[in-house]
Amino acid sequence: MTVSAAEQYLLELINRARLDPQAEAARYGLSLNAGLTAGTISGTPVQVLTHNTELEQAAQGHSEWILETDTFSHTGAGGSDPGDRIVAAGYELTGSWTWRENLAWTGSTSEIDLVEAVEDHHEGLYRSAGHRENTFASDIREIGVAQVEGRFTHDGSTFNASALTLNFASSGTDNFITGVAYTDSDADDFYLSLIHI
């Protein structure tokens, strides 16, 4: 599967937050532990996450299911939970393992901008205590990001929507090297500014 530019951008936002939790808290004007027990999120940097194809495949399937069924839930097709879906996609849970899932959706009656939607998703998930805890979890190393554009009906109204599933996991003892190769074809220094935002 190919990660879209908007999905890669979201991964960069998540990794920026994990590398400097205090700056992310200042950026959104909300304490790292708002709504959580003091010290749940330590404020010290945690390792960045690397993309995993199986986690992405599970996330993609769930985001599509959300839009196809107009159902926003961690319980998915056939009553599956996130662990069921990542294993079905081929992710092996071996040794010491864990998984987590964040979901978000945003909609508009006009055209939806997927990059703006990603920014909205990231901020909204930060503002939710449980989702923030997942984002800053020190026991995860891999992520699957799937943003799907489509129509979503909520409370009797149908929207042009962005449905997002983030599957976080860690399994076994493998180590990863990760990074982004970027050609700044329009010379706007976008990724340089991203790390200084």
Feature names for model-found ranges:
Residues 195-197:
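Conserved small/polar residues in nucleotide/adenosyl-binding loops
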Residues 2-69:
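A short alpha-helix/helix-coil micro-patch that ends at or immediately precedes a cysteine
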Residues 13, 125-126, 186:
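Alpha-helical architecture
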Residues 171-189:
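A short, Gly/Thr-enriched small/hydrophobic beta-strand-prone motif that recurs across taxa
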Residues 57, 61-170:
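A well-ordered secondary-structure block
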Residues 16-32, 106-108, 147-153, 183-188:
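Short regulatory "switch" loops immediately downstream of catalytic or recognition motifs
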